[in-house]
């Protein structure tokens, strides 16, 4: 039976962990002390998720600054940039501190990306757990800096390097016994959003070509990963998530048939927490054998969703895809960026996960 409930990956960092990380940055504690604080926080998060009964747990991404940081720390050839960028919150545009890495030299892996996280989970999780990684198509598009390093003459050439690095990492994770690997790609939402496509064109990048190059990189990775151990593979199509703000809007329909049909994944995690995500009609393109995990629960607002409303939306979705191929989750992480946590209290975070479990029992039990 497929997993009926999960969350995207990140959880709100507890105060003690945030303090330990500040102390480490200031030189007041050593790496071993920080690691102990991380371990304690992860164990507490596992206990909380177990108590709720969610089908798949994570370590909350507590050891990361954001969803890309593990990769960036594990390779050479990148420089970090911090800048102000325009995000959206409600009907307003807001300025959010963002960061990105740019390629400035040969990208080679020098350390594990997530294997240390996975080993701790393998020793301490009592139910299936997942490990999240940024997708190669996304990081190649975002990290490419034209003209800074000649051997990477194009995004596609850089993507080949990240496909190889992430493929090696996933093989190591599978050997460690990781049951579920999720790729995160906020880049696909660019191609749903007219304004984002216009900005991409203004930079001299053809949006349709960029989409197909991104898709080709992610497909190349997913076609190379080990399948013999029954590992679950998923893609999360993110619309941006930082301090309760977001970046992209639009229906999935313009890319759904090609996107959903091209990637050999077991699960597609799709954001559906408000009207900017469009309707469920695109679910007709989800291939047989793939589960659509509907992100109906918002990590951006404190209000805990009503099971009745969630049941209604699951019913609406089942008009386009068999109900047995649905699952339920929040739309994105609760703290994709450790310093840009969403405006949700920890109690509300876990209440939202509990509502997901309750709703799933009511919708799926007996089917």
PLM features: what roles do these ranges have?
Residues 1-367:
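Domain-level signal for soluble alpha/beta catalytic cores
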């Amino acid at each position: 039976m497929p997993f009926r409930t999960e969350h995207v990956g990140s959880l709100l960092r507890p105060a003690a962990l945030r303090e330990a990380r500040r102390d480490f940055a200031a030189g007041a504690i050593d790496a071993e002390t920080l690691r102990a604080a991380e371990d304690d926080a992860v164990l507490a998060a596992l206990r909380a998720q177990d108590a709720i009964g969610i089908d798949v747990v994570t370590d909350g991404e507590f050891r990361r600054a954001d969803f890309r940081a593990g990769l960036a720390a594990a390779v050479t050839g990148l420089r970090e940039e911090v800048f102000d960028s325009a995000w959206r919150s409600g009907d307003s545009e807001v300025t959010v501190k963002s960061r990105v890495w740019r390629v400035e030299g040969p990208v080679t892996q020098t350390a594990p990306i997530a294997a240390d996280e996975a080993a701790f989970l393998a020793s301490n999780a009592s139910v299936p757990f997942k490990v999240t990684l940024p997708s190669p198509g996304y990081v190649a598009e975002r990290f490419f800096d034209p003209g800074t390093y000649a051997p990477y003459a194009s995004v596609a050439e850089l993507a080949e390097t990240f496909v190889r690095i992430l493929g090696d990492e996933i093989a190591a994770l599978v050997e460690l016994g990781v049951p579920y690997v999720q790729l995160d790609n906020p880049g696909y939402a660019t191609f749903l959003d007219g304004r984002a496509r216009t900005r991409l064109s203004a930079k001299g990048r053809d949006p349709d070509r960029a989409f197909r190059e991104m898709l080709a990189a992610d497909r190349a990775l997913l076609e190379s990963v080990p399948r013999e151990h029954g590992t679950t593979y998923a893609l999360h199509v993110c619309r941006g998530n930082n301090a309760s703000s977001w970046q992209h809007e639009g229906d999935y329909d313009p890319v759904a048939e090609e996107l959903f049909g091209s990637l050999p994944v077991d699960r597609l995690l799709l954001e559906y927490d408000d009207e900017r995500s469009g309707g469920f009609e695109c679910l007709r393109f989800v291939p047989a054998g793939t589960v659509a995990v509907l992100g109906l629960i918002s990590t951006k607002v404190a209000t805990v969703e009503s099971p009745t409303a969630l049941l209604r939306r699951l019913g609406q979705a089942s008009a386009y895809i068999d109900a047995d191929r649905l699952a339920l989750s929040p739309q994105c992480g609760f703290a994709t960026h450790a310093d840009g946590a969403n405006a949700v209290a920890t109690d509300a975070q876990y209440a939202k996960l509990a509502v997901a479990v309750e709703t799933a029992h009511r919708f799926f039990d007996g089917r």
